[in-house]
C-alpha cells in the first residue's frame, strides 16, 4: 500500500511549484490523494480491515485541512488543483 519511491518522484515532479519543491501544500495534497486512492481500493477488497479504514479517515482529514489552507491562500490555485486531481466532483 505504500507509495514506491519512483511513484513519489513522479508526483513531486508533476505538482512541484519550483525545482527543489518537495513539501509544498500542492505536493502534499497530491501525495495524500494517491495514498487515499490506493487505500480505498484495498478497503473495497478487504471490507473488515477497520484499522486501515481509520487510517483512511485520518488521511482524508489531513488532505481536507491542506485543501482549506490552499483555498484561503488562492482560490484559483485551489480550483486548478482539485480539477487536476479529479476530486470534489
Curated annotation (Swiss-Prot):
Identification of the protein by name: Small ribosomal subunit protein uS15
PROSITE patterns given in the database record: RIBOSOMAL_S15
Subunit structure: Part of the 30S ribosomal subunit. Forms a bridge to the 50S subunit in the 70S ribosome, contacting the 23S rRNA.
GO molecular function, one term: structural constituent of ribosome
Pfam families in UniProt: Ribosomal_S15
Keywords per UniProt: Ribonucleoprotein, Ribosomal protein, RNA-binding, rRNA-binding
GO biological process assignments: translation
